[in-house]
Amino acid sequence: MKYGFIKVASAIPAVKVGDVIFNTQQIEEQIALAEGKGVEIITFPELSITGYSCQDLFRQQMLLESSEQAVMMLLDFTRKLDVISIVGAPVIAGDLLLNCGIVIQHGQILGIVPKTYLPNYSEFYEKRWFASAQDLRDCEVRYAGHKVKLTPDVQIFQTFDGVQFGVEICEDVWAPAPPSNKLALAGADLIFNLSASDELIGKHHYLKSLLSQQSARTMTGYIYSSCGFGESTQDVVYGGNALIYENGVLLSQSERFSIEPQMVISQIDVEKLRSERRTNSTYVNAQRNIKYSVLGGQFNIRNIEADPTENERDFVLEREVNPHPFIPTSSDMNASCEEIFNIQLMGLAKRIVHTHAKTVVIGISGGLDSTLALLVCVKAFDKLKMNRKGIVGVTMPGFGTTDRTYNNAISLMQSLGITIKEISIAKAVTQHFEDIGQDASVHDVTYENSQARERTQILMDLANKMGGMVIGTGDLSELALGWATYNGDHMSMYGVNASIPKTLIRHLVNHVAESGVDEQSRITLRDIIDTPISPELIPADENGNIKQKTEDLVGPYELHDFFLYYFLRFGFRPSKIYMLAKKAFIDSELERVKISDNDPDSYDEETIKKWLKTFVRRFFNQQFKRSCLPDGPKVGSVSLSPRGDWRMPSDAVSAIWLQEAENL
């Protein structure tokens, strides 16, 4: 396991009903293929040695003995292979015939797992031939030259490097209390399901929903293999399904109704799954003293004797990585944007009602953040059936304000029908510079922050005067980087954008531009989207254009949002985030969709390293600003509220994170 990833496979081999030699040879071909591709664990369909649809032939001693001999052949074949293989076969235990999954590696049987729930309804008659694991008592059987312990309890298999997995069989996952529930609560990271599920109209969609839900509920990687072409079509059809999920997300799936053997392979992020479990107190509380067996503690998986550092250098991530993890997929974009707006406006509406505020006061700069906050205010007032004139938009031109942003601010406020106030900060800030002895020609941090704090003072005093509340405009990305003036734009009475990352804000504003405003507002919003991000605290250039561009100073927001997502959501270390970023922004086979025309066409490794180090350094250094944030609604899975999702001491030391980032 490297960077927390393990490579798994689900195979659908060719099958002939009752021909154990042919079936075993087909399984061997798939195992060899998986070994060559670096797969660490592969699973096959239910009763894959014999074929599932043997029916009363399972009562024939000839078939049962031949099946056992075929497993011995398979053991011999795998003697020098590292891949762990899970195959299906009938196993006799005393007077019981069990439908089992057999886990093998290096020519050894690591364990045998009997099926718990036997379907005996409609087209299924498994109880005619097989007994349930619930009928079994702990015992030891001799099978395929091995002494193997059988138990009705769930069994956990543990690889050499600590990955834990369990096995369930077909109907088990359809039951009200699947064995995978107990397996996951006992520590299984992965669940392998050997299945023989026939095709019925609508069943495939239901199956995928079921597996996705089970993977999400148990926070596991779920690897499913169901038999296909070659099984008997006497009464039903087996279309073949190989599916791999990670915490509810479909990573890979086979072609349906294929007449050829198939295999799907994916890398599952076990580290991410474990992070999800650790942070989910409900999951932890559900864990009980479950009776289970831990098997295979001494067996190895691929490359376990190699130098770990060498392994990580050789590691290649084969799955795609979304460069914009905060942004909804195109098919869900409109619905997701609408949902986000509703969360924001409901949070603000409740605060307005609770405080009996007559007005809300918001600074309008003509930039993205204040635009989104204003749109939320408008929607909240409409929801509460309040007059939009109760929204007081204040534009406060300063030394760096450009005509473009000023005109956009005025135009947007006019078209939305709110109250407009214009208060220049130039005179007040100039007087302040004289009072504190600041040279106005020195454009340092004091020069910049004085302007931000003057604007906040104006907004706060206006809110007091008008019986209103100041609406904060700062976003999640700025909070992560500390790109806000302490007690300046950092402070408000309610921050509606506090958990919205910068990359998502463009899409939210664009959603409104396309669907929720008049033509003049639409034109203005589109120009705001195309405007470079800037606090405009430094005078414009000689042509009157924005000179101070945020992303030139702290780095591209699409990179920082990527870093933030994996750092905060899963607690990944810098080396893993860097590896994922390279895949997402450099090595991806997918066409990259730029968030903005201002984004670079591409990134190189040094650029990613540079801004990753900046992110780590600023994230730690700027925690003191996040420790005293105003209230604001949580919207997504990542938030920096000190009262909820992120509690970190302001004087924490970043040394170990920075050291790893420096060594990339």
Residue ranges and their predicted role:
Residues 1-361, 379-388, 420:
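Enzyme catalytic cores with a strong preference for nitrogen-chemistry domains
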Residues 6-7, 23, 161, 218-220, ...:
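ATP/NTP-dependent adenylation/nucleotidyl-transfer catalytic domains that generate, transfer
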